[in-house]
Regions:
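Short, solvent-exposed coil/turn segments at beta-strand boundaries
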Residues: 26-29, 64-67, 85-89
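Catalytic cores of nucleic-acid endonucleases
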Residues: 5-8, 36-81
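Conserved catalytic cores of phosphodiester-cleaving nucleases, focusing on short active-site segments
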Residues: 25-40
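Non-catalytic C-terminal interaction segments of nucleic acid-processing enzymes
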Residues: 3-12, 73-128
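Short, flexible, glycine/charge-rich loop motifs used to bind or transfer phosphoryl groups or to couple energy/partner
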Residues: 20-23, 57-59
């Protein structure tokens, strides 16, 4: 059986990913929306994406950023950072539009709750 290595294709693919991340990290801060979520994500298994505050569009519904970074914080440190293109996050959030909760100070922020496990359901997210 002949073994052929596709290292050159893998290398090119990997470098493409490196370039995309490098471009993102060098992006203008106004192009990136960053939200930090404390232990709540760990307790519930959901991330909360803000869409309204005091009845007005906010968060995902108001952002002009190209990218959304959702930091999952636990026990005084960042556990991980989830990076999304804003249009992709809007597409995901729309699936859960009926799963909202009022949270924050005086319960003034309306958030869409997205189950973390659903973010990684490749069959659901990627059309093969």
């Amino acid at each position: 059986m002949k073994h052929t290595s596709k290292w050159d294709i893998d290398l090119s693919f990997g470098k493409g990913g490196e370039d995309r991340v490098a471009n993102l990290l060098n992006a203008d801060k106004s192009k990136i929306e960053v939200k930090t979520e404390r232990d709540w994500w760990y307790k519930t298994g959901n991330i909360a994406i803000e869409i309204e505050c005091r009845g007005k569009p906010s968060g995902l519904y108001a952002t002009e950023a190209d990218y959304w970074v959702h930091i999952l914080h636990k026990d005084g440190k960042d556990y991980c950072k989830l990076f999304f293109d804003v249009p992709t996050l809007k597409e995901i959030a729309f699936k859960y539009i009926d799963n909202t909760k009022m949270i924050g100070d005086n319960f003034a922020s309306k958030c869409i709750l997205i189950p973390l496990k659903e973010l990684f359901d490749v069959k659901e997210r990627v059309k093969l």
